[in-house]
Amino acid sequence: MKVALELQPCCGNRSGIGMYTYELARRMRSGDGLEFAGNVFNFLGRNDNENALAGIEMPIRVQKTMPYGGYRRIWHRVPIPYQALFPPADLSVFFNFIVPPRIKGKAIAVVYDMTYLRYPETMNESNLRRIHRDIAYSVARSDRIVTISQFSKREIHELLQVPSEKIEVVYSAPSVTAETADFQMVQQRLGIRRPYLLYVGTIEPRKNLIRLIQAFNRLKKEAGIPHQLVLAGGGGWKTE
């Protein structure tokens, strides 16, 4: 069976979705009847995809004639089959919610949460309209939905009316590769001391950080915990 992995989230400014995609992809090996390959867009070869995908041991097919953003904007109006851009596969896995139109073979979409339905006010309006349309199509087109927690599975089942048996949970986890010296340097530079509670993720409203800070302050006041609260992550939408 030929399995194609959409590795676009690994490229550019790698977010949590990019880390999830990268860590899963680099642990997949061809064999036992499975033949893995990765698909990425790199318009005119402008991006350093080779470095971004280092450690992923599978053939990488690169589409250089069209930018990914351009493809996303036109794919509902211009009938460009995905297989016109990449070789066909028996199974295609899309790690960023969306399955492109006109996919041949079976498809899996990874849907991480239902933020766009539960908390639409935390999202950019133009993105929200596109996500509503694209996720509805993707969920209907996919043969399986993968998500990252039992909570998200229940949400997808409840809000999108997806049968539970169609949804699989594959948990996410960080790759811990830093050396002890790196931790010590960061602790000294930022004034971090043990014990501490650590949040890792994009710093933006939809991560519910205000509630986290409120809960932490309550713990400090009522339970007298000695911990610091450490927030680690890049800036996102409306970080300010």
Protein language model regions, located:
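Carbohydrate transferase catalytic cores enriched for Leloir-type hexosyltransferases
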Residues: 1-240
